Regions:
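Active-site region of glycoside hydrolase catalytic domains
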Residues: 256-387, 396-417, 443-446
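Aromatic-rich peripheral "rim/lid" segments of glycoside hydrolase catalytic domains that contact
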Residues: 421-507
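A short beta-strand micro-motif common to beta-rich folds, especially ectodomain repeats
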Residues: 89, 99-112
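An active-site-proximal structural segment forming one wall of the substrate-binding cleft
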Residues: 167-187, 202-233, 237-284, 306-322
C-alpha cells in the first residue's frame, strides 16, 4: 500500500515538474526585417581639398548598387564590395603639374536612386619664383618663339635634297627679314644632306650644297635671328635613307658604320660653322624611327639606346672641332621626337653642359595634321574636350622632369593645318588652338618653333604662314601669327593661360 502510494506521489511530482517546465514556451526571436534599399546615394564626404602632389582618400557610399562615377581623366575610382547597401570607394587624384588650381565634381549614380556629388579642389603646382630662374629657363627665353623653314633645304627628290623640289621658292634675305618683322625670335632651318654626301670613309659633303646652307644661315644671322641647324630627312622612314635606325638596331656592325658617317658629316658641318657666334645652335637629328614604326611596339629601350648612342657621337664630333663649337648650344631628340619616349632619352655626356632636349608636338593628331581635320578642339568644342588639360599636363610634366632640374627643353615643331576662314567656327578654333599651345609653352618655359612648310590654302598639310621667298604673310596667316606672338610676348597680369582658356570660342 505504502509502495503504491509512493509510486503515485512520484508520478504526480514528475507530472507537476513537466507541467511547470513546459507550460510556457519562450517566444522565438523575430526574423530581422532587412533595411530598405536607399532611394538616394549618400556620401561620407561631399568636398575634398587635395595638394598639388595628388593623393588618395576613401569615401563611404550608401547606395542600392555599386555606383557609376562620372569624373575627369585626372581622377580614378576603385570600388570595394557592396555590403548592406554600403561600399567604400577609393578616390585617387593625379598630381597637378599646372600652375593653376583645378576643380572637379564627381557624380555618383545608381539605378533607381538620386545621385550624389563630390567636389574635389586641387592646388596648383608651385611656380618658380623669379629668384629661382635657372639656366634652362634663361635659354628658353633666348630662343623664345621660333619658326621653321620647312620643306625647303630638307626637301628631297629621288634621294637627293633640293631646295625647290617641293614647290617652295628659294629663300632670300627678305625671307628672314619678314620672319623677324612678324615677331619671331628664332628660326629652325631643317636640312637634308643626303644626295650630297660622298663615299666612305670621308663622306665628303659637296661644297655647293654646304655653301648654300651657309648662305641661308647667313640670311638669318643678318636678320638678327637665332638659328637651329640640323640633319633632317636623312632619317629613314622605310625609304632606305642613310640614318637607318632599323638596320642599326638589328645589326651591330651596321650601327658602327652609320655612327662613322654621323661623325664624319657632323664634323664637316661643325667645321664649316665653327666661327659663327652663339646665335647658331646645332641639332643632331629630326624624327628617327624604327622602320615605319611611329609608335615603337617592342624592344623600345633597345631602339632608343641606339638613338642615345648616335646623339653621343654627334656631341663628341661637334665638340672636337673646337672654336665656338666647344661651347655652342646643341639639341638632341629622342625616338620620333615624341614626348612619349623622352623617358628613354639619355642626355649625352657634354663637357660644355650645353645640350638641350628636343621634342615635337602635334597633339591631338586628328585635329592638327591628321586626315580627319576635326572642326574644333578643347573644352568648348565637341572634340577633345580635355584637350587643354592634356597640353598642360604634357608641358607641366616636361617642366618638372627637366626644366626645373636645369635641363633645357625646346619644342622644335608644333602647329596645326590651316582652316578655311570662311568657316567661322573652324577658323576661331584654329586660332584658339595656336594661342593656347603657344601660351602654355611660354608658361612652362619651353621655347616653341612653329612648323611652316610653305603650303598655301586650308586643309591637311597646309602650314604656310610666311612666304619662303618674300617673307610676306601667306593668305590669312597674319591673324594666326599675331595670335602666336601675342601669346608669347604679352606678359601682362590680365593675360594668362587661364584667361586664354576662358576666352575659348563657343561651339
Amino acid at each position: 500500500m505504502i509502495q503504491t502510494f509512493t509510486k503515485c506521489l512520484s508520478c504526480l511530482l514528475t507530472m507537476l515538474a513537466l507541467t511547470l517546465c513546459c507550460g510556457k514556451q519562450p517566444e522565438p526571436e523575430p526574423t530581422p526585417t532587412p533595411d530598405p534599399a536607399p532611394k538616394a546615394v549618400t556620401l561620407s564626404e561631399t568636398s575634398k581639398n587635395i595638394a598639388a602632389e595628388g593623393g588618395s582618400f576613401d569615401v563611404t557610399v550608401k547606395t542600392p548598387f555599386v555606383p557609376q562615377v562620372e569624373k575627369p581623366t585626372w581622377v580614378s575610382i576603385s570600388n570595394g564590395s557592396l555590403q548592406n547597401y554600403t561600399v567604400t570607394t577609393k578616390v585617387t587624384v593625379e598630381a597637378n603639374t599646372t600652375y593653376e588650381s583645378r576643380t572637379a565634381t564627381l557624380t555618383f549614380k545608381a539605378t533607381g536612386a538620386t545621385s550624389a556629388t563630390l567636389t574635389i579642389t586641387q592646388e596648383a603646382a608651385k611656380k618658380p619664383d623669379p629668384g629661382e630662374e635657372n639656366d634652362a629657363i634663361a635659354r628658353s627665353k633666348e630662343l623664345a618663339l621660333g619658326w621653321n623653314l620647312g620643306n625647303q633645304l630638307d626637301a628631297i627628290n629621288n634621294g637627293v635634297s633640293s631646295e625647290t623640289c617641293w614647290g617652295n621658292p628659294k629663300a632670300t634675305q627678305a625671307t628672314f627679314d619678314g620672319v623677324k618683322a612678324a615677331g619671331f625670335t628664332s628660326v629652325r632651318i631643317p636640312v637634308t644632306w643626303m644626295g650630297h654626301i660622298g663615299e666612305a670613309p670621308e663622306y665628303k659633303i659637296e661644297d655647293a650644297w654646304m655653301n648654300r646652307v651657309y648662305e641661308v644661315v647667313g640670311y638669318a644671322e643678318k636678320a638678327g635671328l637665332k638659328v637651329i641647324l640640323n640633319t633632317h630627312h636623312d632619317e629613314d622612314h622605310g625609304d632606305n635613307h642613310w640614318q637607318h635606325l632599323k638596320n642599326a638596331v638589328d645589326n651591330a656592325e651596321t650601327n658602327e658604320t652609320i655612327k662613322k658617317e654621323i661623325a664624319a658629316v657632323w664634323t664637316q658641318i661643325a667645321n664649316k660653322f665653327k666661327d659663327k657666334g652663339d646665335f647658331l645652335m646645332l641639332e643632331s637629328f629630326n624624327e628617327l624611327i624604327y622602320g615605319t614604326e611611329w609608335a615603337a611596339s617592342s624592344n623600345v629601350e633597345k631602339k632608343c639606346n641606339v638613338i642615345n648612342e648616335w646623339n653621343q657621337v654627334f656631341v663628341d664630333a661637334v665638340r672636337a672641332t673646337g672654336g665656338n663649337n666647344a661651347t655652342r648650344w646643341l639639341g638632341v631628340p629622342g625616338y620620333a621626337a615624341s614626348p612619349s619616349y623622352l623617358k628613354y632619352l639619355t642626355v649625352p655626356n657634354d663637357p660644355a653642359k650645353k645640350t638641350m632636349i628636343a621634342f615635337h608636338c602635334y597633339d591631338p593628331y586628328d585635329y592638327t595634321i591628321g586626315e580627319k581635320q576635326l572642326p574644333d578642339w578643347g573644352h568648348s568644342g565637341t572634340s577633345y574636350k580635355n584637350g587643354e588639360a592634356e597640353i598642360k599636363n604634357l608641358f607641366g610634366s616636361i617642366y618638372n622632369t627637366y626644366i626645373a632640374k636645369n635641363i633645357p627643353v625646346y619644342m622644335g615643331e608644333f602647329g596645326c593645318s590651316f582652316r578655311d576662314k570662311n568657316n567661322a567656327k573652324a577658323w576661331s578654333f584654329f586660332l584658339y588652338y595656336l594661342e593656347y599651345v603657344a601660351k602654355a609653352a611660354k608658361t612652362y618655359h619651353i621655347a616653341a618653333f612653329l612648323w611652316d612648310n610653305g603650303v598655301k590654302g586650308a586643309g591637311q598639310e597646309c602650314h604656310g604662314y610666311i612666304d619662303h621667298g618674300t617673307g610676306k604673310y601667306v593668305g590669312n596667316s597674319e591673324a594666326a601669327v599675331k595670335v602666336l606672338t601675342k601669346a608669347w610676348n604679352d606678359e601682362s597680369a590680365g593675360y594668362t593661360l587661364d584667361t586664354v582658356y576662358n576666352s575659348a570660342p563657343k561651339n
